[in-house]
């Protein structure tokens, strides 16, 4: 798969860079390169190289199904499996698309991630036992799941099979808090409450909560405290708790989809599934029998005479990202009545999505094209951001550039933390990941070099020593290493430092990533979920993989914008720098009657500019 291929590709690339430094002479280097080619092959041809960038993960699915417009990778770390559902729902709310396919996939369980995760004490030495008092950590798992979404009215009109009805979904961020990977009640409670608000539901309206619970002590405890706050005051008895990870293990970006599918199956079979592996329930469950019910054997899911079965499904991720979905079992009569009641609340259809730019911030690396993947040459004001200097090398350059650009952005404008979100659009695959993989997987590189034929063993060991010396300049893997190379943490750092509490995510749509971020941000604004959104892109990779895919031609920089809705802009024209509209390529072709060589992607147009004292004009420029 694309992510796994990318991880292996950049390892091969950085190994060759280290060899180049250790053995400058091309003739002497040639036999060692042959050994690396055999053990750590890299893709030579540009077309193939473009297929291993992470954004390529979505394209085979789109091609298989004949989808023309949008194929986007959504990254919210372990919240991704429900974040993608929440994001997908935005494309249904304004009737842009009759269907949206949301997929969660995990199939790149590489050693780099496992070693890094172990440094924060997250891995179990035994088994996955979420919600158990003695749970010792998570067990990584792989898998994929998909749900096809469409408007309820459309499904009823066309007699489609409906497995469940999403009444609300939300993604909320912790904002300023503890470590970037520490769970936080504030964001978790906010996500669940916002999801419940989609149906105006109270605590007694929820039968079951499918927890994110991974089996880590800190994570399970914080989530149970969050659920306790949501469920306290129930009059209808305790809420059922579930976790599927003792069966599937932790699928990271696929975990949320696994939770959702499990709940749909439970509704279909009208039963609560047991939480396997629990010997001693978590002490918060034991101490609050009036709030929590943990099923250790299958149990009947009682039916409520006045409403369908209903559940909350959670997925939380590093970077303080918390996604929650409120779903209920399909009942034809109940939901037909619901469609009639809510038919007037659907947002009007519109082709283009427009946002008003009210502030901008930009930061460019001082050394544009110098150096290689082995070099870390991006300056960072660690004193201002209160980051210990020893941790700076573990933060990817994109994270540092994004922080500085956003500092400049917010020097111009203030934000309301609760009403602001972040959507960054940028190619995935951070440069520091290559260095981290090289450091951790050095034995693979050394083994390949020692397999070199027709060279004196003493010469081989000298080359090995040279490569090992280069690797020694890379900091050892520590607690801070994992978030330092996670793509979604580029947005997560901004939320944590600047106290942003709305949705937070990174989108990868290749060259169209920035336009994709504007497109989705406009939907959150139009739906009234946020008043302000930070959009933009931060990119600092010099990898040949990104160059071959045409993604590294603009140097290393970060550009961010604070955007607001068009409705707000009409009331405050004096504060608007410009208004931009984003459309898909096919929409532009239909509007203007021409054909483009592009078969997918977005088009950004400036449709308004300031007009001296008279405000702003809606003339397309």
Language-model regions, residue ranges each:
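Condensing-enzyme catalytic core of the thiolase-fold
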Residues: 1-621
């Amino acid at each position: 798969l694309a992510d796994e291929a990318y991880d292996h590709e950049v390892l091969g690339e950085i190994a060759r860079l280290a060899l180049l430094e250790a053995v400058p002479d091309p003739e002497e280097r040639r036999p060692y390169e042959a050994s690396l080619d055999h053990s750590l092959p890299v893709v030579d041809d540009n077309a193939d190289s473009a297929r291993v960038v992470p954004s390529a993960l979505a394209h085979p699915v789109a091609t298989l199904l004949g989808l023309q417009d949008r194929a986007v990778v959504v990254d919210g770390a372990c919240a991704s499996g429900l974040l993608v559902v929440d994001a997908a729902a935005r494309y249904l709310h304004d009737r842009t698309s009759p269907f949206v396919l949301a997929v969660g996939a995990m199939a790149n369980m590489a050693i780099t991630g496992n070693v890094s995760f172990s440094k924060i004490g997250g891995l179990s030495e035994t088994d996955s036992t979420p919600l158990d008092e003695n749970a010792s950590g998570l067990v990584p798992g792989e898998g994929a799941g998909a749900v096809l979404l469409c408007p309820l009215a459309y499904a009823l009109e066309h007699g489609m099979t409906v497995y469940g009805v999403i009444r609300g979904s939300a993604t909320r961020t912790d904002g300023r808090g503890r470590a970037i990977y520490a769970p936080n009640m504030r964001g978790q409670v906010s996500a669940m409450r916002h999801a419940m608000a989609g149906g105006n539901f109270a605590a007694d309206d929820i039968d079951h909560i499918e927890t994110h619970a991974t089996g880590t002590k800190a994570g399970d405890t914080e989530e149970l405290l969050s659920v306790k706050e949501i469920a306290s005051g129930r009059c209808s008895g305790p809420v059922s708790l579930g976790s599927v990870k003792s069966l599937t293990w932790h699928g990271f970006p696929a975990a949320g989809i696994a939770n959702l599918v499990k709940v749909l199956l439970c509704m279909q079979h009208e039963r609560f599934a047991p939480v396997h592996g629990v010997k001693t329930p978590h002490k918060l469950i034991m101490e609050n029998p009036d709030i929590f019910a943990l099923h250790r054997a299958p149990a009947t899911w009682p039916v409520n005479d006045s409403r369908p079965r209903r559940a909350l499904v959670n997925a939380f991720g590093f970077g303080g990202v918390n996604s929650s979905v409120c779903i209920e079992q399909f009942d034809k009569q109940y939901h037909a009545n619901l469609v009639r009641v809510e038919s007037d609340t659907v947002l009007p259809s519109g082709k283009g999505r427009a946002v008003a730019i009210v502030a901008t911030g930009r930061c460019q690396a001082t050394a544009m094209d110098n150096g290689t993947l082995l070099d870390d040459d991006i300056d960072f004001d660690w004193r201002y951001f209160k980051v210990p200097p020893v941790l700076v090398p573990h933060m990817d350059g994109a994270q540092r550039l994004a922080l500085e650009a956003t500092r400049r952005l917010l020097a111009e404008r203030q934000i309301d933390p609760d009403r602001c979100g972040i959507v960054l659009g940028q190619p995935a695959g951070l440069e520091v990941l290559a260095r981290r993989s090289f450091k951790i997987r050095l034995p693979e590189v050394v083994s390949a070099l020692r397999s070199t034929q027709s060279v004196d063993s003493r010469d081989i060991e000298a080359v090995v020593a040279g490569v090992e010396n280069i690797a020694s300049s890379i900091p050892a893997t520590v607690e801070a290493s994992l978030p330092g190379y996670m793509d979604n943490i580029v947005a997560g750092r901004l939320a944590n430092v600047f106290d942003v509490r709305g949705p937070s995510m990174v989108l990868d749509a290749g060259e169209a990533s920035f336009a994709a971020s504007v497109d989705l941000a406009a939907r959150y604004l139009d739906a009234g979920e946020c008043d302000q959104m930070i959009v933009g892109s931060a990119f600092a990779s010099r990898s040949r993989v990104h160059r071959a895919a045409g993604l590294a031609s603009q140097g290393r920089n970060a550009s961010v914008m604070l955007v607001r809705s068009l409705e707000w802009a009409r009331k405050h024209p004096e504060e608007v720098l410009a208004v931009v509209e984003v459309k898909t390529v096919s929409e532009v072709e239909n509007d203007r009657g021409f054909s483009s060589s592009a078969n997918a992607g977005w088009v950004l147009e400036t449709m308004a500019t300031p007009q001296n004292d008279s405000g702003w004009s809606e003339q397309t420029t």
